[in-house]
Design a protein with these regions (language model features):
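Short acidic/polar capping segments at secondary-structure boundaries
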Residues: 8-11, 18-19, 61-63
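Metal-dependent DNA phosphodiester-chemistry modules and their immediately adjacent helices/loops
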Residues: 8-9, 17, 245, 306
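Beta-strand/loop-dominated core regions that host nucleotide or nucleotide-derived cofactor-binding catalytic loops
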Residues: 9, 16-18, 24-28
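Conformationally flexible catalytic loops at phosphate/diphosphate-handling active centers
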Residues: 1-7
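Short linear motifs in exposed loops
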Residues: 15-16, 57
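Conserved alpha/beta-domain cores
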Residues: 33-309
């Protein structure tokens, strides 16, 4: 049997196919290259040939030992929190870890994706995660930990798998319930920026309504949006090759335009090495902030800097 263990991202793939093996080989090669000597491009400003500024953020896991700031990343674009739940971290442990992250970030934005039982259904740990959360929409202790840690820095919290405005309202209600409980107990809290992960076609279509009901940030998970739009849920590796499908780009364009009309920032998140080549199309649609895996940051920066946008 063969397997791919990605300790950086907390994933395990058993019996990987050829595409997955090639992708990992590329990541390993880039990692070795980056470890040999700093690339001078990392220190250059994020500007296209046409003079358009863009911003790079880095993707990481909540259970990582350090807050990474490498290859010119301007902040932490997405912090995945599932690994912390799988390690059975208590509310106090999560609060302490989040405070460490925010203090180490030194004022730059930290965007955390909440744990959701419906997210990443194809991940190896999905069944265990859903069993542990007992079917809850959100993990209450995590929301409480986020509110308690918020005063330490620039925290943004985004909710995945939101299908429409009513679903968004339920997320807000759970946050408000936790806030009321903590305040009534005399616990110091802060209110982070709250946003929505656009990973379902219905969320993209209802983005304007979601923003009108309080979403302050739109984070587009391009690979998941592609999977759900094109019916590739059970073949996730195929989504990477379809990121520029016209149907997907039309949904993204709609979200970007609706967000621009409301001055709401838009991120593209979860960019892997294999997805880098598609990102110029998203730049042309108006996306200016890209959150990428560490190995993808430099290749992405170099490619975007070559664009005439």
């Amino acid at each position: 049997h063969r397997a791919i263990l990605d300790a950086d991202n907390g994933t395990l793939v058993v019996e990987p196919d050829g595409a997955q093996i090639a992708r990992v080989d590329c990541q390993i090669a880039l990692s070795r290259l980056h470890g040999q000597q700093p690339d001078p491009v990392a220190a250059l400003p994020c500007l296209t040939k046409g003079g358009t500024a863009f911003r790079l953020m880095q993707t990481c896991n909540l259970i990582d030992n350090e807050v990474p700031h490498t290859q010119g990343a301007a902040g932490i674009g997405i912090v995945r929190s599932e690994s912390a739940i799988l390690c059975e971290q208590s509310e106090q442990t999560q609060t302490s870890r989040l405070k460490e992250y925010l203090r180490s970030a030194e004022g730059v934005p930290v965007v955390l994706r909440t744990c959701d039982t419906r997210a990443d259904d194809d991940a190896p740990w999905s069944a265990e995660l859903q069993a542990r959360l007992g079917g809850d929409r959100l993990f209450k202790s995590q929301i409480r930990a986020l509110l308690r840690a918020a005063p330490e820095g620039h925290l943004c919290v985004v909710f995945p798998m939101v299908k429409d405005a009513a679903d968004w309202d339920r997320c807000l209600q759970e946050v408000n319930d936790c806030k009321d409980e903590l305040q009534s107990s005399g616990v110091e809290i802060g209110m982070p920026m709250l946003g929505c992960v656009i990973d379902m076609p219905s969320a993209a279509l209802m983005a304007a309504d979601i923003m009108d009901r309080g979403a302050q940030l739109m984070v587009i998970d391009a690979e998941d949006l592609t999977r759900y739009t094109l019916g590739l849920v059970h073949n996730p590796t195929a989504a990477v090759g379809q990121l520029t499908n016209p149907a997907v780009l039309r949904l993204v364009k709609s979200v970007v335009e609706q967000a621009a009309a409301r001055s709401v920032p838009v991120y593209i998140c979860g960019i892997t090495v294999a997805a880098v080549s598609a990102m110029p199309e998203y730049l042309k649609l108006g996306v200016r902030t890209f959150s990428a895996e560490p190995a993808a940051l430099l290749p992405l920066k170099k490619l975007l800097m070559e664009q005439e946008v």
